[in-house]
């Protein structure tokens, strides 16, 4: 996602009306946003409801299928709906077809190596693709193309998920890497 922001000059966080400028609903959810291409996030900005200890947010979901990152609940889009969460959670909804690589390592803010283990979250219901971009995390060598790209594709109709061989400056990624794929 960071590379996309750099290469395409598109911020990581976008208001809903950025991709849906003709949708009236996109303008009505002022605190809701897209995080990258995979997530719709709707922070709760109202006090808790008395008796249920939950805050409420009205969420607009564009057409499509969405899965709650934390609860696994599935929602159909093309509508407004109310969501309730306690103070420790907010609605984070993954689009169908999203492929989300994550690390299981605690790297900290001073991390300068690419992770030795990945947990790839794959959200079914639609086709999807993602290119994992990795560089040296230290220099501007990426500006000269010194990086590694690993393409991942989900074909929902065929029920296949493919991780293509990494391409580029392969010494930038660990020689041994554990990959755990989780389907949602």
Label each region the model flagged.
Residues 1-184:
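Catalytic core of carbohydrate-active enzymes
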């Amino acid at each position: 996602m960071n590379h996309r922001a750099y290469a395409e000059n598109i911020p990581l966080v976008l208001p809903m009306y950025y991709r849906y400028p003709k949708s009236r609903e996109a303008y009505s959810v002022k605190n809701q946003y897209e995080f990258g291409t995979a997530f719709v996030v709707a922070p709760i900005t109202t006090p808790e409801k008395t008796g249920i200890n939950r805050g409420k947010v009205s969420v607009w979901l564009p057409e499509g299928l969405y899965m709650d990152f934390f609860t696994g609940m599935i929602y159909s889009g093309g509508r407004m709906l109310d969501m309730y969460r306690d103070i420790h959670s907010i609605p984070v909804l993954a689009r169908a077809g999203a492929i989300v690589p994550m690390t299981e390592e605690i790297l900290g803010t001073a991390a300068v190596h690419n992770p030795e283990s990945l947990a790839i979250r794959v959200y079914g219901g639609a086709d999807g693709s993602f290119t994992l971009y990795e560089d040296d995390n230290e220099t501007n060598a990426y500006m000269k193309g010194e990086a590694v790209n690993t393409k991942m594709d989900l074909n929902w109709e065929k029920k296949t998920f493919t991780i293509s061989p990494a391409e580029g400056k392969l010494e930038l990624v660990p020689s041994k890497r554990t990959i755990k794929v989780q389907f949602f």
